[in-house]
């Protein structure tokens, strides 16, 4: 495990059930400080007042997509280096390329397992 479980993690997804699943997996992995937002725009507002150490976001959301959120984070000097993991049903190669060009840290296609998320986080923080 190459990550600090005391870090603050932001989980962004428009489906409460998916946020709960990701939070449960993070809790199983030992994370204790998890905040959430139900879309990219809400996440941007939250990030104005809170520093996070990791962002895990869905792609398809109302108001602001996960890709737009990623681009916003990377354009902000204060957040540009925050690891960003995209967890999405978007498995098309074109979307993966867009995310990589926007400097996503890791890309996970739904459905996924707790083991997959843990492995991706190990890669992000190794």
What are these regions (language model features)?
Residues 16-35:
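Two-component/phosphorelay signaling modules centered on CheY-like receiver
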Residues 36-54:
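Acidic, metal-coordinating helix/loop segments flanking the phosphotransfer/catalytic sites
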Residues 61:
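Receiver (REC) domain active-site loop signature in two-component systems and cognate sites
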């Amino acid at each position: 495990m190459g990550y600090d479980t005391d870090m603050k993690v932001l989980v962004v997804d428009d489906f409460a059930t998916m946020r709960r699943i990701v939070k449960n997996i993070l809790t199983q992995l030992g994370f204790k400080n998890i905040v959430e937002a139900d879309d990219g725009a809400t996440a941007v507002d939250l990030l104005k007042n809170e520093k996070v150490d990791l962002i895990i976001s869905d792609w398809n959301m109302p108001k602001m997509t996960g890709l737009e959120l990623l681009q916003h984070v990377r354009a902000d000097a204060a957040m540009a280096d925050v690891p960003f993991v995209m967890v999405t049903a978007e498995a098309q190669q074109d979307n993966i390329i867009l995310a990589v060009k926007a400097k996503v840290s890791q890309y996970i296609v739904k459905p996924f397992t707790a083991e997959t998320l843990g492995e991706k986080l190990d890669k992000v923080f190794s």
